[in-house]
Every structure is written in C-alpha cells, then in structure tokens.
C-alpha cells in the first residue's frame, strides 16, 4: 500500500524541502531522538536546522517545563523528563501531523494532565495527532476517537464512550468502579461531577 499526505506519497513528501518538519514522530524510545550532549544543545541544533528563532525554543521549553534539565545529558535525566524533552524537540518546527508512540510513558499524573491539555490546544489549531498508547485512562479523557487493535485487527472504533463503556476488560478504573451506579462515566472527573450534581439535588430537595 501507499501512505499519502496532502496528495503526495510519503517518499515524495520527504524529498520536498518545503515540507520539512510538517510530520513529527515520537518513537517509543525517546533516547533515539538525541545525539547532542545536553537537552539545550539538542533543541538549539534542531532549531538551527529549521532556521527557527530563539523565541520558538524558549516557548517549547516553557510549555514542556524543561528549565531544570537544559544543561543535563539526555542519558542522565528521568524517563518522564526525557519524554518531555523529546516532545519539545518534536514541536519545534510546528508539525501539521504528529505521530506519538506511548507518549505518556514515565509521566506523572500532573504532567499527563498538562500534556493532554497541550494536545487539545494543538488539535484546536488544526494539528492532526495520532497516538498509540496502552494508557486507557489518558485516551478516554483526551482522545476524540479511539480504535482498539487485537492481533493486528481493529476490533472496536469510535468515540471513547463507544469503545470503552461497554468493554468489561479494556476500560478505565472509573468505569469499572461506577458501572451500574453512574451512567456513562469514564473518567474520575465525570464520577466527581455526577456526585456533585447528586449532592446539589439533595440539598435543593
């Protein structure tokens, strides 16, 4: 088969210098993205390759909260920090399409929420995002559409509600806990919202 983007096959697309940076890929092992001795040098080299101003580097550093690791070797920082640094490098040229492989691996709950909000902002401005992940909780909260693969075949496809609500095994903890009590709850926020609405109704009565 062929993979096409904007009418061009990927092989043709890669040879088009004007298309450089339009497709971004984050591989499962983010160390593969680094060749320089520090995170700062890596970002600067990438920005130089795309002829980007310093302000763009500073923006992604701020977005991904990398100030504390800029002088560190990529091999010396934590998995979550490395993941954030790799995503920062990916975002520098402002790609139109982003492929992410296990992007939330190593991230704590706080930064997962921050990262999910970032993906929403990117999607809102027209960036297409394809995420491969085993993090069902993250997908349920932040994905617009999901597809579940088993043995190389798509066995379910649709909104997170379509894919996860009726699934007994591949679903979120919130869904398992609230099933039969709270309708259509996939995330902790939805469970909390339902409880708050019940409490308000009780007080009103």
Region locations from a protein language model:
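Conserved ABC ATPase "signature" region
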Residues: 52-69
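Conserved ABC ATPase signature
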Residues: 73-77, 81
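Catalytic Walker B motif of ABC-type/P-loop ATPase nucleotide-binding domains
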Residues: 98-101
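H-loop/switch region of ABC-family ATPase nucleotide-binding domains
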Residues: 133-134
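A short, surface-exposed alpha-helical micro-motif characterized by mixed small hydrophobic
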Residues: 139-141
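Conserved beta-strand-loop-alpha-helix hinge in the C-terminal portion
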Residues: 153-176
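ABC ATPase nucleotide-binding domains
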Residues: 170-205
């Amino acid at each position: 088969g062929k993979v096409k983007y904007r009418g061009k096959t990927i092989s043709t697309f890669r040879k088009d210098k004007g298309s450089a940076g339009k497709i971004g890929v984050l591989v499962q092992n983010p160390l593969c993205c680094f060749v320089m001795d520090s995170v700062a040098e890596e970002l600067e080299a990438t920005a130089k390759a795309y002829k980007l101003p310093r302000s763009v580097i500073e923006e992604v550093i701020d977005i991904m909260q990398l100030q504390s690791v800029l002088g560190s070797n990529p091999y010396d920082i934590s998995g979550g920090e490395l993941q954030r640094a790799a995503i920062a490098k990916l975002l520098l040229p402002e790609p139109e399409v982003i492929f992410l492989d296990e992007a939330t691996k190593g991230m704590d709950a706080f930064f997962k929420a921050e990262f999910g909000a970032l993906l929403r902002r990117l999607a809102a401005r027209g960036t297409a995002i394809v995420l491969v992940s085993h993090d069902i909780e993250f997908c349920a909260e932040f994905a617009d559409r999901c597809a579940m693969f088993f043995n190389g075949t798509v066995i379910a496809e649709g909104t997170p509600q379509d894919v996860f609500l009726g699934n007994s095994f591949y679903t979120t903890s919130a869904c398992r806990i609230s099933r039969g009590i709270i309708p259509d709850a996939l995330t902790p926020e939805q469970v909390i919202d339902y409880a708050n609405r019940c409490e308000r109704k009780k007080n009103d009565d």
